[in-house]
Amino acid sequence: MGRPLKAIVTVKLADHGVSARKQWLADMKTEAAISQIYSVSGETDTVVMMNLTDMEEFQELSQRLFAEDENVLQYQSLFVLEQHKFDLAL
C-alpha cells in the first residue's frame, strides 16, 4: 500500500525551553509516518515532513500529535500536490 500522501506541517511551540523542546522532538521521532523534522528560524519553530497512507491516518496523527499536545501552540498542514524534484544526494 505504501505511504503516497505527503504532508508538510509547520508547528509553533508554546514552551521553547530546552527540556520541553527535547521531549516534544523525542515524541515526534517515534512516529513511523514522520520522515523528517527540522527546527527552523522565522514565524514557525519546527517543520515536520510526513508520509501517510491516507487522510484518515493524517487526521488521527494530527489530532494526537498536534491538536491534543499542550506544547503545540499552532500548526498548519500543507499537502504535496505534485513533486517536481526529490534528490537527497549531495
Segments the model singles out, each with a brief description of its role:
Residues 1-90:
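A compositional/biophysical signature of low hydrophobicity enriched in polar/charged and small residues
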